[in-house]
Regions:
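Hydrophobic positions on the alpha1 helix immediately C-terminal to the Walker A/P-loop
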Residues: 20
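Short hydrophobic/aromatic beta-strand immediately N-terminal to the Walker A/P-loop
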Residues: 6-8
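Phosphate-binding P-loop
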Residues: 1-4, 115-116
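Conserved phosphate-donor/acceptor-positioning beta-strand/loop module used by diverse small-molecule
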Residues: 125-126, 141-155
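Short, surface-exposed basic-aromatic patches at helix termini and helix-loop junctions that form
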Residues: 23-26, 137-146
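Conserved substrate/cofactor phosphate-moiety recognition/catalytic segment
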Residues: 24-117
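The conserved Walker
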Residues: 12-13
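Conserved glycine(s) of the Walker
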Residues: 16
Length: 155
């Protein structure tokens, strides 16, 4: 088995990360994870098909992960999910009330960490607003991944 790879495209909003990645997709950059794309898709369908990302992802583990998370609205903290989603094998049906950027970001976080465990190559983008993204790359290296960090900025 070849060495798994992670490609992180970092940069501010509007810098062109998604545009660059679209050019790279045909060049075997692994599964592409993008919270913005996922949020749009969830708002249209209210459904997440985990097999779209990989057959080895476990829907019940994702639900456990999501139900342990909260989101902040000003000074208020509330659960990420207002109700448990309906799960049928790899397909998860969310309440339209719960679908927002926080939910999409947490789903992508879950998939990223599962891919580390499963040693699956992938590419993702981030505004890199927290040092945990660098820690994630370090953790990936410790697990045998070859890591790439591309910083995209506009002038």
């Amino acid at each position: 088995m070849s060495q798994p790879r992670i490609r992180m495209f970092a940069g501010p909003n509007g810098s062109g990360k998604s545009t660059i990645i679209q050019y790279l997709l045909p060049h075997q950059i692994g599964t592409y994870l993008n919270a913005d794309d996922l949020e749009k898709q969830l708002k249209q369908t209210q459904r997440l098909d985990l097999s779209h990302y990989h057959d080895r992802l476990d829907a019940s583990k994702l639900i456990i992960f999501l139900t342990s998370k909260n989101k902040k609205h000003g000074d208020l903290i509330s659960p990420l999910l207002s109700q448990n989603p309906v799960v049928q094998q790899k397909i998860i049906q969310f309440s339209s009330f719960d679908i927002d950027s926080y939910l999409a970001a947490r789903i992508i976080d879950f998939i990223r960490f599962e891919f580390l465990t499963l040693k699956i190559s992938f590419t993702f983008e981030t505004v890199m607003s927290h040092e945990s993204k660098v820690d994630f790359l370090k953790q990936a290296q410790q697990k045998g991944f070859k890591t790439y960090l591309y910083y995209v900025a506009t002038v």
